């Protein structure tokens, strides 16, 4: 909108107009006004100061007392005027200059008017007196004249109103003066037609009072649109325009011209994409505008804009094919590497797709789903892909496509490079589980299924076995079938057995070790009839024992009377109490924490681990980035947590406890545990490496760079991970954006399980009561958890609502700079965080649902995932934003806009609004005072180097707040 002061200054040059209703100065014939009595006023001819003939009225009965001489004009039509102005030109004789006066000499006369709906006045009607005539004023001269002087003309202007009837008469009363009424001009004032700020305002008559303001509605000039409504100006009593309300700016495709009085079309080759005060701009690179008034420049042939790119963005093209493709075949896998295309299309978002085709003779078809790609098949960011699970001795053709953000706009398939390979002979895969088909004192009968991928003809199977605990004294036998009977075994002995297959390419991997036991020698000699009762009795006793154990466990759970030793076993049994659902087991219920680590975490040999650099510090020690290289697996980056030297046993237990927790989880949105190192120093926990680090800092570094759909996708991933945890009866207790990690593909994963605890399943709303004195992250924690230290999945839902707010505000601190106590007080008074800038209403409503005081009314994580899926499918619902509190039952906190006057310099102001990184940009460009900063536009920000859209929006909003504060504190000149 145009600033109000600017519009007023533009209008100040437009002078008010006067329109005459009657003027005796130009009358040359008789005026024929009515005089009473006949001996009073008389009409005479004379000359004005320019020697022009005029008709005047005069009276000079000063020698007679009790004078009451009246003069009335003809009927004057009102013409919709509410206030009338009368200009009187007259002369008055100085009474002292008249000799021998016997009467009462006056030097004034009275001025009246009378309203009427028609020209109905007569010589005796209305009565010649005040009321019905309405007195306007007593007219006194500024100067009178004597006999020696020439007549000195006085000019007086009087006004009266409001008048509402069809017309009026003017009347003059003489009470004994020597007066000459030279001319009478009757007129009214009006504000002239004007155009300013791309708006036209009609000619407007002033109001009924001198102080009246008459509203004149405005209309935008052609090709301009209203910025705010209503569009109007006020006409004051002097016929001057003032107090503009609303404004217009040129529409998209048009720019200002004629000193803001017209909008002209953009010329060919230029465009203007948005309504506003800006000028037309040359078309961006690789685009054109072939007609005038263009709002966007269309891309030239072969160039495109991606979805979401603005009209200001240059058009780009698809990349050329990848170059220098290298293939490295290893049996039934291949590693493909390539160099980037020679032409990237003017973009930096190049991705790669690897299309696999299996060729039989001359016919090639798409590979089946068994073929695996690492890291993935489509949308690969790095220039290396490993393809495995190919068939042996088979020809394959791989197309490596290069795509970017505009490839989907091109009608052509992406450019690609083709490489053909032939796989080698490979050894068979491992044998599935080995099973027992009979056990005697001196023999075992076993069977197994063939390998899933034989990769050729199976020649035979090798069976390796040894008595448990005597791995060095093993034996092997071979079999050409999938069964074997092994003789010469020791009675009542446990044997460990492994099987592997052999082809012409060699042996495959051994199966997983299985344990089988031969029976006692007496049992071997027993007859089948003797064994049946024993078997039946054993089975019956076993069933009774299992039922008894289950009943005991259920009773113990319901009464909560488990002791420490019982807890270890009953919690493990939970995995079997809920069909199809794996429940979390608290590692702190183990008497020996090392047993929990062995159960849930994989031990990794220290020789497989290489620490590269320290990237941070944790509660127990340093956090490092490193590499993990295990046999048969590709080298991978990992995050390594180390336990500092001089630790206590309790610290070691707590440190490894987090690994025991993570090892129980298997979900794409939960951080994955790779293993632990406990047999050497330092003790380590290895997890997958997340390239983009913590979510809060990642969002702050990429402020404004994601679409709403992408942000909702991030929220959906976090909710999916929390749904998985809640279904395992697991409470996180410390869910916050700082504890969400982001990988290179923007997949978010829940991490940091240091504060988490097991969630009991003995009632519908399980809780955990923390130890007194435990640290609680106030800004993310539900009120019941703060007050009573009770944590539930519902309190995790509250924390998830705060995470939603962090994501939509690009990592802003919840509750800003409020103290923890102020946060607690605000929540207790039912205040909730307002929607972040440009946050869709549906997302803020979901946040408010997560922050309901009654935890039983908060949504479950499964419901949150479902709600986010619906929003993603219906993207239109994400375009509705709610700037206010309409429809919101909770009160919303209001972050006060910092007053610029409290900051001594522009640099201090930038620091206060978290934009301190641009101090040098502002100062170098000359924006060193608040007066200059308040005039900045989006083009100015772009010119000084503020290129991030989110930062531009934040700065422009702060500049707008500064303008508002200036308008409220500085006087406006009218």
From Swiss-Prot:
Stretches that traverse the bilayer: 535-555
Phosphotyrosine carried by residues: 590
Eph LBD domain mapped to chain residues: 18-196
Localisation per UniProt entry: Cell membrane; Cell projection, Dendrite
Single GO MF descriptor: ephrin receptor activity
Residues binding ATP, per UniProt: 615-623, 641
Main location: membrane
Protein name: Ephrin type-B receptor 3
Organism expressing this protein natively: Xenopus laevis
Lineage: Eukaryota, Metazoa, Chordata, Craniata, Vertebrata
Gene encoding the protein: ephb3
């Amino acid at each position: 909108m145009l600033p109000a002061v600017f519009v007023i200054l533009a209008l100040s040059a437009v002078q008010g107009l006067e329109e005459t209703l009657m003027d005796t100065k130009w009358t040359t014939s008789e005026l024929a006004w009515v005089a009473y009595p006949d001996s009073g006023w008389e009409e005479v001819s004379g000359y004005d100061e320019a020697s022009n003939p005029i008709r005047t009225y005069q009276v000079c009965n000063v020698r007679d007392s009790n004078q009451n001489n009246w003069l009335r004009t003809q009927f004057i039509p009102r013409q919709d005027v509410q206030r009338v102005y009368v200009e009187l030109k007259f002369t008055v004789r100085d009474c002292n200059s008249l000799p021998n006066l016997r009467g009462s000499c006056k030097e004034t006369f009275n001025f009246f008017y009378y309203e009427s709906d028609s020209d109905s006045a007569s010589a005796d009607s209305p009565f010649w007196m005040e009321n019905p005539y309405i007195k306007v004023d007593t007219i006194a001269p500024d100067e009178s004249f004597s006999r020696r002087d020439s007549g000195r003309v006085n000019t007086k202007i009087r006004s009266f109103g409001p008048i509402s009837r069809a017309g009026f008469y003017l009347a003059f009363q003489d009470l004994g003066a020597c007066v000459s009424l030279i001319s009478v001009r009757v007129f009214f004032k009006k504000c002239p037609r004007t155009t300013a700020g791309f708006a036209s305002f009609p000619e407007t008559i002033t109001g009924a009072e001198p102080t009246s303001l008459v509203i004149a509605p405005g209309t935008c000039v052609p090709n301009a649109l209203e910025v705010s409504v209503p569009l109007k100006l006020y006409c004051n009593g002097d016929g001057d325009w003032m107090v503009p309300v609303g404004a217009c700016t040129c529409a998209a495709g048009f720019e200002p011209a004629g000193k803001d009085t017209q909008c002209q079309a953009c010329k060919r080759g230029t465009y203007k994409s948005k309504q506003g005060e800006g000028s037309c701009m040359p078309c961006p690179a690789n685009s054109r505008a072939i007609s005038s008034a263009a709002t966007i420049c269309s891309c030239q042939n072969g160039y495109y804009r991606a979805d979401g790119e603005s009209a200001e963005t240059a058009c780009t093209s698809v990349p050329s094919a990848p170059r220098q493709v290298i293939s490295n075949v290893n049996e039934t896998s291949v590693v493909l590497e390539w160099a980037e295309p020679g032409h990237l299309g003017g973009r930096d978002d190049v991705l790669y797709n690897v299309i696999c085709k299996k060729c039989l003779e001359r016919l090639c078809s798409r590979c089946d789903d068994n073929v695996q790609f690492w890291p993935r098949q489509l949308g690969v960011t790095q220039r290396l892909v490993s393809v495995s699970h190919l068939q042996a001795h088979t020809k394959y053709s791989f197309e490596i496509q290069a795509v970017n953000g505009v490839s989907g706009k091109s009608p052509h398939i992406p450019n690609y490079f083709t490489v053909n390979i032939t796989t080698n002979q490979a050894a068979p895969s491992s044998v599935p589980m080995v099973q027992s088909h009979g056990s005697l004192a001196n023999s075992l009968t076993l069977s197994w299924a063939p390998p899933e991928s034989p990769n050729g003809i199976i020649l035979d199977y090798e069976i390796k076995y040894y008595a448990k605990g005597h791995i060095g004294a093993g034996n092997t036998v071979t079999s050409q079938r999938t069964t074997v009977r092994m003789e010469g075994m020791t009675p009542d002995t446990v044997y460990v057995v492994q099987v592997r297959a052999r082809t012409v390419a060699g042996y495959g991997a051994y199966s997983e070790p299985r344990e089988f036991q031969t029976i006692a020698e007496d049992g071997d000699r027993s007859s089948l009839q003797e064994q049946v009762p024993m078997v039946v009795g054993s089975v019956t006793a076993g069933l009774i024992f299992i039922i008894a154990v289950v009943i005991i466990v259920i009773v113990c759970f319901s009464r909560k009377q488990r002791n420490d030793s019982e807890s270890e076993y009953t919690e493990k049994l939970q995995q079997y109490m809920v069909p199809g659902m794996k429940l979390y087991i608290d590692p702190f219920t183990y008497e020996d924490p090392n047993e929990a680590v062995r159960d849930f975490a994989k031990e990794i040999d220290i020789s497989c681990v290489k620490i590269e650099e320290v990237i941070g510090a944790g509660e127990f020690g340093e956090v490092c980035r490193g590499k993990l290289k295990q046999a048969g697996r590709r080298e991978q980056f990992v995050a390594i947590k180390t336990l500092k030297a001089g630790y206590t046993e309790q610290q070691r237990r707590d440190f490894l406890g987090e690994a025991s927790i993570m090892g129980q989880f298997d979900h794409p949105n939960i951080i994955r545990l790779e293993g632990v190192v406990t047999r050497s120093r330092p003790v380590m926990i290895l997890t997958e490496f997340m390239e983009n680090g913590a979510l809060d800092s990642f969002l702050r570094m990429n402020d404004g760079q994601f679409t709403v759909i992408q942000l909702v996708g991030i929220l959906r991933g976090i909710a999916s991970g929390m749904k998985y945890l809640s279904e395992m009866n697991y409470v996180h207790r410390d869910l916050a954006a700082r504890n969400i990690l982001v990988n290179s593909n923007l997949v978010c994963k829940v991490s940091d399980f240091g504060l988490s605890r097991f969630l009991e399943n003995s009632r519908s709303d399980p809780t955990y009561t923390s130890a007194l004195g435990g640290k609680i992250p106030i800004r993310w924690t539900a009120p019941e958890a703060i007050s009573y230290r009770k944590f539930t999945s519902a309190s995790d839902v509250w924390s998830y609502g705060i995470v939603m707010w962090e994501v939509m505000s690009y990592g802003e601190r919840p509750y800003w700079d409020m103290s923890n106590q102020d946060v607690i007080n605000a929540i207790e008074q039912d205040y909730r965080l307002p929607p972040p800038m440009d946050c869709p209403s549906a997302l803020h409503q979901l946040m408010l649902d997560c922050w309901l005081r009654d935890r039983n009314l908060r949504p479950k994580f499964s419901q949150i995932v479902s709600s986010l899926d619906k929003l993603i499918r219906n993207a239109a619902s994400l375009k509705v934003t709610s700037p206010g509190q309409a429809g919101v039952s909770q009160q919303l906190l209001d972050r006060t806009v910092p007053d610029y006057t409290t900051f001594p310099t522009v640099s201090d102001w930038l620091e206060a609004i978290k934009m301190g990184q641009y101090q040098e940009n502002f100062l170098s460009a000359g924006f060193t005072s608040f007066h200059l900063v308040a005039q900045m536009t989006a083009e100015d920000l772009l010119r000084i180097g503020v290129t991030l859209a989110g930062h531009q929006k934040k700065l422009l909003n702060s500049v707008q707040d500064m303008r508002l504060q200036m308008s409220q504190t500085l006087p406006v000149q009218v």
